[in-house]
């Protein structure tokens, strides 16, 4: 079947004709969360054996005027996709919201300024909430891998004989840190308190659409469907067990390519005919981990902690009674929610006027990068080994010339070029038919407030930190910012755990 026919068949038989949208505030990410190895949820309701589902929570209600701007700027998963879900106002009063208490254990985290000495175990949590926040070791590639990939998983099956060496990270100057001093100033905990006082329900969309795959679907068709619908992940429905058993994400596609492309025993075109169920059985071999999720009544503070601590990009919000997926929270959505109130209602702490160089927010050492002349296969190796979701592409002089992300990899399926992973990353970027988020940069002298505004406005997952000559200095991600604004004032370092 020709690609065009396949795409038409997918859209006609698997999905509704409405332009789909995937709510992602804050992915990458991310981004990305593949729950292929996560356990069953037998209590979840059946989607009536359909491959797409539209979940609406509550009726459309009149929103207060200050939220009109959010409807105008509501992000889409990809530029150009219209019809994104509307955001639910935090001030919206409904009967359902009244049933969700906002005083949760993690929401009572003590601000750093309230104690005499900074805690040594910076990511320690109350005992009654530690289990919910860290019940799964499911990790994501960058702040959002779906499941952990053992370091020697290719070697143990004799599928990968040798891996190309990773591109060395450029040497960068050590930035002066002034963040600890800022945390002790008056008003430094304003964003922490805001996220503690609002629940996940407040940040949920009033209506959102989820694309659902049956585990009997062929892998190739599933990945084509991700591209056709502009989404990065889809829940998996097992018709035999009558339950959701995980999620399929872009990371799974990367792992398929990474595992079998150089295999002398299996051809890649044979793998694409496998069903999702077969891939799960081969790769996971029965090793399932519990689904990382959150309740609508949990605070946004807990959502931020869970995303960063577990290094995932997508956090399902599950109905506490039925177990149905109500929404998917992401780094982007959480930051957008906070940013809207920051601009209009919340006071601006003094640290927003400090420069990135002063505060040291971001990653500046041991950066994962790829040369523009390196083959795509090298980028896949780095994605898996370094667990990152995007790679700054640099030339021989160390200047940033592009950004290659995990979502770029899925377009290999759309272009049917996944049998040609020896082409260079630079060539792959030039062949890219869809304009993705691209490279947005910032410089050390820019303030934290300017960086947050740019990320929220451009709806990207990260900014590349460069000097005046476009040489790479570091990366400022959504996780870095949410950690600094929300968790650090409580003495919690989820990134460093």
UniProtKB/Swiss-Prot annotation:
- Region labeled Disordered — which residues? 16-143
Q: Which GO MF terms does the UniProt record name?
A: AMP binding; ATP binding; protein kinase binding; protein kinase regulator activity
UniProt xrefs under InterPro entries: AMPK_gamma/SDS23_families, CBS_dom, CBS_dom_sf
For the ligand (AMP 2), the binding residues are 232, 332, 405-408, 432, 440, 461-462
Q: Which residues of the sequence carry a binding annotation for AMP 3?
A: 313, 363, 368, 389-390, 461, 477-480
Q: Locate the residues binding ADP 2.
A: 232, 332, 405-408, 432, 440, 461-462
Stretches of Basic and acidic residues bias are at 68-79
- Where, in this chain's numbering, is ADP 1 bound? 247-252, 292, 313-314
Q: Which GO terms describe its cellular component?
A: cytoplasm; cytosol; nucleotide-activated protein kinase complex; nucleus
Locus of motif AMPK pseudosubstrate: 300-321
UniProt keyword terms in alphabetical order:
ATP-binding, CBS domain, Fatty acid biosynthesis, Fatty acid metabolism, Glycoprotein, Lipid biosynthesis, Lipid metabolism, Nucleotide-binding, Phosphoprotein, Repeat
Q: How is it modified after translation?
A: Phosphorylated by ULK1; leading to negatively regulate AMPK activity and suggesting the existence of a regulatory feedback loop between ULK1 and AMPK.
- Residues bound to AMP 1: 247-252, 292, 313-314
Q: So which domain of life are we looking at?
A: Eukaryota
For ATP 2, which residues are the binding ones?
A: 232, 314, 332, 405-408, 432, 440, 461-462
Q: Where is the composition biased (Polar residues)?
A: 39-54
The residue ranges of the CBS domain are 204-265, 287-345, 363-423, 435-494
Q: What does this protein do?
A: AMP/ATP-binding subunit of AMP-activated protein kinase (AMPK), an energy sensor protein kinase that plays a key role in regulating cellular energy metabolism. In response to reduction of intracellular ATP levels, AMPK activates energy-producing pathways and inhibits energy-consuming processes: inhibits protein, carbohydrate and lipid biosynthesis, as well as cell growth and proliferation. AMPK acts via direct phosphorylation of metabolic enzymes, and by longer-term effects via phosphorylation of transcription regulators.
Record-stated family = Belongs to the 5'-AMP-activated protein kinase gamma subunit family.
- Domain remarks in the entry? The AMPK pseudosubstrate motif resembles the sequence around sites phosphorylated on target proteins of AMPK, except the presence of a non-phosphorylatable residue in place of Ser. In the absence of AMP this pseudosubstrate sequence may bind to the active site groove on the alpha subunit (PRKAA1 or PRKAA2), preventing phosphorylation by the upstream activating kinase STK11/LKB1.
- What is the protein name given in its UniProt record? 5'-AMP-activated protein kinase subunit gamma-3
**Protein source organism:** Bos taurus (Bovine)
